[in-house]
Amino acid sequence: MSRYALIVLIVVVVAANLCEASDCGPNRVYKSCGTGCPETCENPDPDCDRACHQGCFCSKGLLQDIDGNCISPDKCP
């Protein structure tokens, strides 16, 4: 019975991670090890710790605006 429970647990964890990755929204990508200091219009080159943070981040080359949207740097106010 414990082997069955382990298989179910693995399937649930994998499914949860796949759901998170698809819920990022436009111009965002899911990373299992991203920065805790996102690149923003206000701070495009943040100095941050190297700790891994899991979640959705702006796609490469985009910055996060004040509303949390990912935009190209030339669109920053």
From Swiss-Prot:
Q: Which UniProt keywords apply?
A: Disulfide bond, Secreted, Signal
Disulfide links within the chain = C24-C56, C33-C52, C37-C48, C41-C76, C58-C70
A Gene Ontology CC term for this entry? extracellular region
Query: Gene3D superfamilies per the record?
Result: Laminin
Q: Where is the signal peptide?
A: 1-21
Main location, first listed in the record: secreted
Question: What range(s) does the TIL domain occupy?
Answer: 24-76
Cite the record's tissue specificity text: Expressed by the venom gland.
What function does the entry list? May be a phenoloxidase inhibitor that stabilizes or inhibits venom phenoloxidase while it is stored in the venom sac.
Q: Which family does it belong to?
A: Belongs to the serine protease inhibitor-like (TIL domain-containing) family.
- The protein depicted here goes by the name Cysteine-rich venom protein 6
Origin species: Pimpla hypochondriaca (Parasitoid wasp)
